[in-house]
């Protein structure tokens, strides 16, 4: 066995994970003779220098390992971002689909409400020869028309207040004009 300095022996012992010697005493605090006796009696420390790896090679391996770790971390970060982006897109698509479904349901409900609010007509149809003041509201079929929408369809003022879409062409109502027709 070749003779090694105490500092080299301590470095090797620490590298191998041996921190404490006899009776749990820290090896760096041990006397030289006690430390050498401990090393000689210990079977777990190989004191030969043949197995030593050059420091440059260790540094290169460490750098390669760091690069691999950084690469793996970056891949994980990128994958997490991609997953979050996909989840956000799915969520936005679901929201869009639900909003469209809600809008369709609201349109259906408004159409049903209009149909339910219209009483069944028991009178004969109105003659086309009548003057405008005799034209009844197409929604309630009770009151004469006096309001014109932007699409040029007409209704009575009470029905016009409740409407957001034209009952005839289903276009949104942007403008409501109250008109009074002349009596002949």
UniProtKB/Swiss-Prot annotation:
The keyword Zinc-finger applies. PROSITE patterns: ZF_RING_2. GO terms for molecular function: zinc ion binding. Residues 54-106 form a coiled coil. InterPro entries: Znf_RING (IPR001841), Znf_RING/FYVE/PHD (IPR013083). Keywords: Coiled coil, Metal-binding, Zinc, Zinc-finger. A zinc finger (RING-type) spans 137-170. This is Putative RING finger protein 175R.
């Amino acid at each position: 066995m070749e003779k090694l300095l105490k500092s080299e022996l301590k470095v090797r012992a620490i590298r191998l994970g041996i921190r404490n010697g006899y009776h749990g005493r820290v090896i760096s605090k041990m006397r030289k003779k006690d430390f050498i006796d401990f090393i000689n009696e210990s079977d777990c420390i190989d004191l030969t220098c043949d197995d030593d790896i050059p420091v440059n090679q260790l540094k290169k391996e460490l750098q390669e390992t760091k690069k691999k770790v950084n690469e793996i971390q970056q891949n994980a970060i990128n994958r997490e971002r991609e997953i979050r982006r996909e989840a956000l897109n799915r969520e936005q698509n679901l929201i869009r689909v639900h909003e469209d479904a809600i809008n369709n349901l609201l349109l259906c409900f408004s159409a049903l409400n209009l149909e339910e609010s219209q009483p069944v007509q028991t009178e004969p149809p109105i003659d086309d020869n009548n003057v405008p003041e005799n034209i009844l509201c197409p929604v309630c079929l009770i009151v004469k028309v006096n309001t014109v929408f932007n699409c040029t369809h007409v209704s009575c003022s009470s029905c016009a207040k409740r409407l957001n879409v034209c009952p005839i062409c289903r276009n949104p109502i942007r403008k409501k004009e109250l008109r009074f027709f002349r009596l002949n």
